[in-house]
Amino acid sequence: DFRDNTFDLVYSWGVIHHSPNTPEAVSEIFRILKPGGQAKIMIYHKWSIVGFMLWFRYGLLALNPRLSLADVYSQQLESPGTKAYSITEAHALFDDFSDVRITTLLTHADLLTSRAGQRHEGFLLTLARKIWPRRFLKFAFSRAGLFMLIDARKG
């Protein structure tokens, strides 16, 4: 346990969306930051290309189109219970902070430019890697990246 108002900076890259209680983790970050301290956090973005790809494969093609994105992320992306948030939901998570800035970032996973997602290997992923419209996605869906970067200050 850290005392209140201890740190000038808290940095977390892809961690708190795996915790059982993400809002509690954000509250703890707020508590341990000094006034004026900065939080730099990355959590997963719900409305990402990765989320759509996983829903397409494990929802639509599995004849389960009602499968929620929450279930897709929880069951198919990394570890069980993984969560992803909309920008609105992220703002609500960081409501106690002042000067909250949120941006999304297209990743190698959104653009299928790496071997990430090996557990999903198969014909569909192999084909998608060959025909994936990367330039179009970068242009038309630049805000649909998996990574949501949050820069927040404790007022």
Where are these regions (language model features)?
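A short glycine-rich, Lys/Arg-flanked "PGG" loop and its adjoining helix->strand segment in the class I
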Residues: P23-Q38
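A C-terminal cap/extension of S-adenosyl-L-methionine-dependent methyltransferases
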Residues: R57-L61, L67-V72, E78-K83, I87-A92, ...
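Conserved class I S-adenosyl-L-methionine
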Residues: Q38-L67
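Short conserved AdoMet
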Residues: P20, K34, D95
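Short catalytic/ligand-binding loop motif for oxyanion handling, primarily in non-cytosolic enzymes
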Residues: D1, W47-F52, A109-S114
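A short acidic, Gly/Pro-enriched loop at the edge of an enzyme's catalytic core
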Residues: D1-L9
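A short SAM/SAH-binding and catalytic strip from SAM-dependent methyltransferases
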Residues: D8-N21
